[in-house]
C-alpha cells in the first residue's frame, strides 16, 4: 500500500481509543482504511497475543518479558517474526525498516514516543497493556476483523459463564470465596489486585477479594516482609514465580515454611494452586486469559492443589 493512495490513513493519525467503545459489525475506526492492513507491528505483549488470536501474523513484535525471545505459547505463530526491541524501548529504526501499515502501542508504555511512531505509520494507541477485552475490540476494528473479535469475546463469555457455575458447585455454600494472587519474586512477594490482568478475570468469574485488596489502589500490593502475610489471608491462593530464578525459588521455599504462612486459611485448607506466571501476569491478551481459565478449571474440577 502506497502512502499517496486515497484509502491510505494519514501517517500522522493517532487513534486515541475511548474507554468502553463497543465494536459492532461494519465499524471502521476513523483514519483506518477498510482494507485490513497487511503489515502490523505490535509493541506490547497483549497486542502480539491478540494479533495471533485474530489470525494476523505481525511483521514485527517486541521481546517477551520471560521465556525470551517469545513466550512459548506464542512461538508456533511468531517464531519467524522479527523483533524490534523491548516493550519499554522499541527500536524506531527497526520499525521503520519493516515498513508497517499499522502500529499498535499503548499510552502506558509509549506515550512519549507516539509523535515519532505516528511519523512511521498510523498508530492505534491503547490506554493500558493488560485490558485484554479492550485490546481485542480495538484491534479487531483496526484490522477489519470485527467478526473474529466478536466471536472470540462470545466464546470467552461462554467459558466464563460455564466455569463460574462449576466454581459455585465446587464451593457450594461458601461461594463466593475470597482469593489472593501471589507473585513470589527474589526479594519480596507481590499480591495482585482486582484491577490487574489476573484480577479482572477472577472478578469476572465471581471470586471475592480480601478487604485489603478491595481498598487498595493500583494493580498490586508489595509485601516487604513475612509479617505482612495476614493482609492477603484468603480462602484460596493462586501463586506463581517469575522465571526460573533460584533466588525466587528460595523465597518460595522459605515462604511456605514460615509460621505465618501456615496460619493462613488457604494453606491450612490445601487451597494453594501453583499457576503459570506468563499466563497470569505477563501475557495480557485473550489467549493468555484463556490459559488462565484452563488453570482455574482445575480448581473447579477439584484437581489436587500444590
Each language-model region and where it sits:
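Structured C-terminal subdomain patch of bacterial secreted/periplasmic proteins
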Residues: 38, 236-306
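Basic- and aromatic-lined ligand-binding clefts that recognize polyanionic substrates
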Residues: 39-54, 152-212
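Ligand-binding pocket segment of bilobal, Venus flytrap-like solute-binding proteins
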Residues: 217-246
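Extracytoplasmic substrate-binding proteins
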Residues: 113-187, 271, 279-306
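Proline-aspartate-enriched helix->loop->beta-strand connector
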Residues: 99-103, 234
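Short helix-initiation/N-cap motifs at beta->coil->alpha
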Residues: 84-92, 216-225
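A short, structured surface patch at a secondary-structure boundary
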Residues: 48-97
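N-terminal secretory signal peptides
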Residues: 1-13, 20-27, 31-34
Amino acid at each position: 500500500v502506497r502512502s499517496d493512495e486515497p484509502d491510505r490513513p494519514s501517517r500522522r493519525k493517532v487513534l486515541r481509543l475511548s474507554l468502553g467503545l463497543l465494536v459492532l459489525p461494519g465499524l471502521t475506526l476513523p483514519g483506518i482504511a477498510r482494507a485490513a492492513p497487511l503489515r502490523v507491528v505490535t509493541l506490547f505483549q497483549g497486542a502480539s497475543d491478540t494479533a495471533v488470536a485474530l489470525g494476523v501474523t505481525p511483521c514485527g513484535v517486541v521481546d517477551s518479558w520471560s521465556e525470551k525471545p517469545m513466550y512459548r505459547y506464542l512461538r508456533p505463530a511468531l517464531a519467524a517474526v522479527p523483533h524490534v526491541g523491548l516493550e519499554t524501548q522499541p527500536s524506531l529504526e527497526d520499525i521503520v525498516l519493516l515498513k508497517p501499515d499499522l502500529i499498535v502501542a499503548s499510552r502506558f508504555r509509549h506515550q512519549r514516543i507516539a509523535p515519532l511512531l505516528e511519523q512511521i505509520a498510523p498508530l492505534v494507541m491503547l490506554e493500558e497493556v493488560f485490558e485484554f477485552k479492550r485490546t481485542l475490540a480495538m484491534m479487531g476494528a483496526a484490522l477489519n476483523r470485527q467478526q473474529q473479535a466478536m466471536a472470540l469475546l462470545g466464546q470467552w463469555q461462554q467459558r466464563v459463564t460455564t466455569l463460574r457455575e462449576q466454581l459455585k458447585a465446587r464451593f457450594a455454600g461458601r461461594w463466593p470465596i475470597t482469593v489472593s494472587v501471589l507473585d513470589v519474586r527474589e526479594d519480596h512477594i507481590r499480591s495482585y489486585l482486582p484491577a490487574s490482568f489476573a484480577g479482572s478475570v477472577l472478578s469476572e468469574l465471581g471470586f471475592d477479594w480480601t478487604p485489603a485488596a478491595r481498598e487498595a489502589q493500583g494493580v498490586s500490593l508489595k509485601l516487604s516482609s513475612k509479617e505482612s502475610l495476614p493482609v492477603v489471608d484468603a480462602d484460596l491462593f493462586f501463586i506463581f514465580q517469575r522465571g526460573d530464578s533460584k533466588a525466587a525459588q528460595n523465597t518460595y521455599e522459605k515462604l511456605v515454611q514460615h509460621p505465618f504462612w501456615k496460619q493462613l486459611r488457604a494453606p491450612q485448607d490445601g487451597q494453594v494452586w501453583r499457576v503459570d506466571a506468563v499466563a497470569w501476569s505477563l501475557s495480557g491478551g485473550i489467549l493468555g486469559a484463556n490459559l488462565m481459565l484452563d488453570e482455574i478449571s482445575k480448581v473447579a474440577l477439584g484437581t489436587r492443589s500444590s
